[in-house]
Structure formats: structure tokens, C-alpha cells
UniProtKB/Swiss-Prot annotation:
Gene that produces this protein: AP5M1
Topology term for the membrane: Peripheral membrane protein
MHD domain location: 206-476
Protein's name according to its UniProt entry: AP-5 complex subunit mu-1
UniProt-annotated location(s): Cytoplasm, Cytosol; Late endosome membrane; Lysosome membrane
GO biological process, one term: protein transport
Principal place of residence: cytoplasm
Keyword Chloroplast applies: no
Subunit structure: Probably part of the adaptor protein complex 5 (AP-5) a tetramer composed of AP5B1, AP5M1, AP5S1 and AP5Z1.
Domain of life according to the entry: Eukaryota
Alphabetized InterPro entries for the sequence: AP2_Mu_C_sf (IPR036168), AP5M1 (IPR039591), MHD (IPR028565)
Amino acid sequence: MAQRAVWLISHESGTPLGGIVKFSRRYPTVEKRAKVFNGASYVPVPEDGPFLKALLFELRLLDDEKDFLESRDSCSHINKTSIYGVPVGGEELWPVVAFLKNGMIYACVPLVEQTLSPRPPLISISGISQGFELLFGVQDFLSSGQKTDSELNTKLSQLSDLLLQTCPFGTLLDANLQNSLDSINSASVTHLQKQPAWKTGTYKGKPQVSISITEKVNSMQYDKQEIADTWQVVGVVTCKCDLEGSMPNVTISLSLPTNGSPLQDILVHPCVTSLDSAILTSSSIDAMDDSAFSGPYKFPLTPPLESFNLCYYTSQVPVPPILGFYQVKEEEVQLKITVNLKLHESVKNSFEFCEAHIPFYNRGPITHVEYKASFGQLEVFREKSLLVWIIGQKFPKSMEISLSGTITFGAKNHEKQPFDQICIGGTAYLKLHFRILDYTLTGCYVDQHSVQVFASGKPKISTYRKLISSDYYIWNSKAPAPVTYGSLLL
């Protein structure tokens, strides 16, 4: 007995779709079970927009839908059960439990633990009765004591946390949401008075919360048709909560912009007290699709005294921040190099620093360099056989820069010159080093106003972001190069 998804929809005539989704919750773990149980008859749960339109059509609540349709309006299709088959993308999502009450549509999709073709009797689907119980419980919670729109919005904002307690992983434990809310509130008060054994002391002083998001981007670029470039973002959220009391409670929310890249492979600190199942099931192993959970990512927690890493995550961003190619041509004791770098237009063009390190292994010291750089400066470290292209703090308006030159080497001295077992012959790389402050490649951020602190005093909340290059290599496209894959960049 479980639910695949739950919706609360406000029926509002005159809006573009005829209604507004006020709340929705999907259970990815239940959805995977549905895919196994239903087999070839499986129909995925659609996004909110398509589902809203299809459900309003089936309930005959669309403003512009007045025509008679045999499949929906004939006498043989009179609905007496509030259970519908909703047409979505040429298929039919069934069973959908839905009813309209006081301008609000309550809907859910129960799990059917067998094939849907032929349709099993309703009495054999235990998730349907559980779905009705859940929806009636939500209806009672929203209607109790509600007088104004602000009170309704407050209760809607509490639903997400309440369903974590009353319906974890889509399985209903308690349909009385008000009792659950009261128990959560009373528990938060009583627990503040008890010092946990793992917390060695309490903080005394001005309350403050500091949250820092650091993303590191890895990349391997080859400029070859037969080898795909790879890149990946690895992020960490670091927190320091200086709050009075033995058990202060904090809720931190990570948000993404509309075009942000969903966070995956999320690992959380043990101090996190509860978590939406959709956060834990988002994995980089699975193929990305439009249904990927894109936040907000809420972390209710009881913070320790010291600084701690709230969570780690990865993300599959669509493009690397800097694209480039590197070509090396050998002529006797000389090397001719060509480098081209381009900053992607979506990336913030403001660096704390940006450098390209170009090492030359298994050769003698650099004796002479002739070069032409369209931007920045070139520093030569002769004994280390290293060129450092200092790009600076900003790319030019064209977002593209280039470097070409000829390097002459002296006789080898195996004791002093850098040696590498991979970079032999033409195999060579350029490594980028950069840092961008107040920016993340995924777009992930913490809104100061979304941080909830349940402790004495009003804390000062500080948030920081930065993007740092990690293993960011551009290999010589004119020679063999070691190949890596996205899953190995971790």
C-alpha cells in the first residue's frame, strides 16, 4: 500500500490552464516499484503541467471544453467512484483518485502491485483506500480553522514536512496531520531542554549561521571525434551554526534557478534529522530526464558546535565552463604549441584568478621562448620546463583567447628535469587553475530568508559560494592521451 504521487490543485477559472498546482509530491522509490509491478502496462507519472491539464479535462473543468466526448461523457462512463483514467501522452494513467472540494482538487496515484492489463478490480487495490484516507486527512488539515488565504498558504507550506512524518516513502502511517504537527512542535520544545550525549558543550554569544557552497569542476578535453570530452561538478555545503541552547533546530534549503542542473548522489551529515526520499534517490548512474528532482533541497538538522559538511553532491552540467584545445608539434629540439580557450557565455566572467599551466616533461630545460598571446601574460620557469599563462580576472568581450609559440629546450638532465611516465613524446596537457567567487556552476544557492532557525535570539545568517577548478585538463589533440569517463571523475 503506497502512493506514487500526490497533488493539491486550486481550481481557478480564467487562469491559462484552469487551475494552479499548489502542492505536489512524488515518491521515486514507489515509482520504481510501479515500473516493476506493471511491466509493459506501466505509464509514468507526468509533470505537473501535463497532469493538471489532463485531470481538468477528465473532470470537465476546463473553461474551453464544452463539447460532448463519447469516451468521457457517455452514459456508460458515468463515474461514481472518484477514480479516473487520465489521458497523458497517448497513454492512460490509471488509477487516479481525485475529487473537488471547496475549490480545491485533491488527487493521488496509488501503487498497483500487478499488471494493469487487464485492469484488476478496484477492491483488490489496497492503495486506493489508503489514497482516499490520505487525501481526506489532508483536506481536514487544510480546512480546520482556516479563514484566510494566508492561513491556507501557511498550512500548504507545512505539508512538505508533515508528509515526511505521516507518509514516508509514499506509505501512510497517520492520516491525522494536525496531531502530527502538534507532536512535532511539542517535541521540538521538550527536546531543547535535554543535552545530547554527543554534544560536549553549548554555545554562548551572538547567534550566527554561516553557510558556504563550494563546487569543484573536473574536466578532460581531447578535441577528438573518437574520444568524448568529460566533465563533472562535485559540491560540498559547509556550515557553522553558533546558536545558544542544547538542541537548536535549523532548516537549510538549497535552491536552483529555473535552468539549474539537478543535484545528484547526495550524501548528508548524520545531524540531518529527516529527508525527502526524492533527494536520496537522484543518482548520476541514471540517465537524466525532465522528471529529475530539482529542489528545493530541504535539510532539517540539529547542528553540532563545530564546522561541519552538511552534504556532498555531484551534478551533470550541460557544458564545461571553459572549452579549449591544445596542439603540440615537435620539430627537433623545438616544440610549436597552439592553445585556444573559450569561456562559455553562461559562466560569470569574473575570476579571483585564472591561469593555464603548460608543463613539458621528459625534456631538458627551456632555453628560449617565442610566443604571441592575444590576452594575458606568459611566465617562463626554465628549470621546471613550465609555462604559466596568467589570464587574470576576466576574459575579453569575445570570451575567446589564444596563445601560440615556439619553445626551445637544452640538453636533458634526468636528476633535475621533471619526469612523467604518461607524458612521453607528443602526449602532453594543459591544466587550468581558476576560482570564481559568489558563483556556482549548477546555480545552487542558499536564500538567507529561507533559512529557518528555532533557537533563542535572531541570528545573523551569512552565505557564500565559489567555483574552483580541480582536475581540469586539456590534452594535446595531435597525440595519444589517457581516457577517462564521467563516473571515474569522482
